[in-house]
């Protein structure tokens, strides 16, 4: 990593204009291999990326040798049968090159992230808590109880692969690297259709997920840049009227001149976005935008977003991609939770001398619950139960031991409880535990060709201990046996700051 940082610091312009020579450096392939095993450069676990263990430094050396032997490294994507390297295993070379390409283009952004964290004096140990999915719900609890309207947004996909290339041209001005990017995109298009997929997650190729995650995030960054632009313009205009920041006289003078020229068009449009209570949250291809403003303001946001996406970013937005609802009467689904703002009435008694006052108040409270029907559908899709929620047995491998099978089912149960620990009503989660526990018992009974009841009797209470959740284990140690720990675990809401990806079974998008 020190060699790479030294290379990038030779000249600031080289960080973006000369990425292609890095493909011929052996330490880049070693870096890609290490990140594949330990996590990406942005501190994310590699189970997200579906990493291939065959990707070794020895194979990287052989690939570099073959690249040096080639005379034509500029690709032609017109012929789908043409490949970069005339070798027997061309698919694996293409896969490895796309992984290396993703690592190379991540590096300048990662160095920028590290420098930004150092400027803001944020420790690297706090990165995981900042990236935690549960931290989003803490933000919801703090902000959404005071808002009025919420918009569910499905971010559109590019209508053509060349749009992704044009997006990266702002950062990568190296022509050979852009040709490589086109090659990888069109190769993936020939094997997997990436244009207007049915679901956002299907946008990523299962084979080169690191590469497509980077491209997708770059694409989303372009769509979200309009929020930053409008926020900055709105802030500048307010400062222009107040004349408080004298060191920006020239900047505000230009903006004032700009307003004189386009006062009738631009200023009339911009006032619609002067909403200090607008909040925006995104995960993958879905976003939530909430505001304290009126329904008319939210409709204006929808109108301008759709037009900007289609006219400026060339993104086709479906008519039903943005839904506007009143926050008090609507439950929105996000990150595996069903969230809503509930009015909780309360009675306050106050006595002054001989007079007794009773005041009825209503407090807005942000609530999160587990959607049972989508979760049971996910379990049915994974063959743990049928669509009605009745547990079924899964086919077990002959070489799998009983302890491995029990550990696998118990780990799935604990992970689900861990992810949904922020739910106010956990009673529904115990039905999920029942499904997984009985599915495990039926799987073991099927393996040993015996009845479920007899097999459970033989296993004893140790079998049920494997399905104890983390909260239940802690509460059982803190409180005595006579205390009802189940009541506490049902009512307590816990947010964990170590969860940086959505649970696979909870992702029903």
Swiss-Prot record:
GO terms for biological process: mRNA processing; RNA splicing; tRNA processing. One of its GO terms (molecular function) is RNA binding. Its main location: plastid. Pfam families: Intron_maturas2, MatK_N. Keywords: Chloroplast, mRNA processing, Plastid, RNA-binding, tRNA processing. It comes from the Eukaryota. It is found in: Plastid, Chloroplast. GO terms for cellular component: chloroplast. The keyword Plastid applies. Signal peptide: none annotated. The keyword tRNA processing applies. Usually encoded in the trnK tRNA gene intron. Probably assists in splicing its own and other chloroplast group II introns. Belongs to the intron maturase 2 family. MatK subfamily. HAMAP family: MatK (MF_01390). This is Maturase K. It comes from Drimys granadensis.
């Amino acid at each position: 990593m020190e060699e790479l940082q030294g290379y990038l610091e030779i000249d600031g312009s080289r960080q973006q204009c000369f990425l292609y020579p890095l493909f011929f450096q052996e330490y880049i392939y070693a870096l890609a291999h290490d990140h594949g095993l330990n996590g990406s450069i942005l501190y994310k676990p590699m189970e997200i990326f579906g990493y291939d263990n065959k990707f070794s430094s020895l194979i990287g050396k052989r690939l570099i040798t073959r690249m040096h032997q080639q005379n034509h490294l500029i690709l032609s994507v017109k012929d789908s049968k043409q490949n970069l390297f005339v070798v027997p295993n061309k698919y694996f070379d293409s896969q490895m090159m796309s992984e290396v390409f993703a690592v190379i283009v991540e590096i300048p952004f990662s160095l920028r992230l590290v420098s930004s964290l150092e400027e803001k004096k944020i420790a690297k140990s706090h990165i995981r808590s900042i990236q935690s999915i549960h931290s989003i719900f803490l933000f919801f609890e703090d902000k959404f109880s005071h808002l009025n309207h919420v918009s569910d947004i499905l971010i559109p996909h590019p209508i053509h692969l060349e749009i992704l290339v044009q997006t990266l041209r702002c950062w990568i001005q190296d022509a050979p690297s852009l040709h490589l990017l086109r090659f990888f995109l069109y190769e993936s298009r020939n094997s997997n259709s990436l244009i207007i997929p049915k679901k956002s997650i299907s946008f990523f190729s299962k084979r080169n997920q690191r590469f497509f995650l980077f491209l997708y995030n770059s694409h989303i960054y372009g769509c979200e840049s309009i929020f930053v632009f409008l926020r900055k313009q709105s802030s500048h205009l307010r400062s222009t009227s107040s004349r408080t920041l004298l060191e920006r006289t020239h900047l505000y003078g230009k903006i004032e001149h700009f307003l004189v020229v386009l006062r009738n068009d631009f200023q009339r449009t911009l006032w619609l976005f002067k909403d200090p209570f607008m909040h925006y949250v995104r995960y993958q291809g879905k976003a939530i935008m909430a505001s304290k403003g009126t329904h008319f303001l939210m409709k204006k946001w929808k109108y301008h977003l759709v037009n900007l996406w289609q006219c400026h970013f060339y993104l086709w937005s479906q008519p039903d991609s943005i839904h506007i609802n009143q926050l008090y009467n609507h439950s929105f689904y996000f990150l595996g939770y069903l969230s809503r703002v509930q009015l909780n009435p309360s009675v306050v008694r106050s006595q002054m001398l001989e007079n007794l006052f009773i005041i009825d108040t209503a407090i807005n409270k942000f609530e999160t619950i587990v959607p049972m029907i989508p979760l049971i559908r996910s379990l049915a899709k994974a063959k743990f139960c049928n669509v009605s929620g009745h547990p079924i047995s899964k086919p077990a491998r002959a070489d799998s031991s009983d302890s491995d099978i029990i550990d696998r089912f118990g780990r799935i149960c604990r992970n689900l409880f861990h992810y949904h620990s922020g739910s106010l009503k956990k009673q529904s989660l115990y039905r999920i535990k029942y499904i997984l526990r009985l599915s495990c018992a039926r799987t073991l009974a099927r393996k040993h060709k015996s009845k479920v009841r007899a097999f459970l009797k033989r296993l004893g209470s140790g079998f049920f201990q494997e399905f104890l959740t983390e909260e239940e284990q802690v509460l059982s140690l803190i409180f005595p046996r006579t205390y009802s720990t189940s009541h506490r675990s049902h009512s307590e809401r816990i947010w964990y700051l170590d969860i940086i990806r959505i649970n696979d079974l909870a992702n029903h998008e």
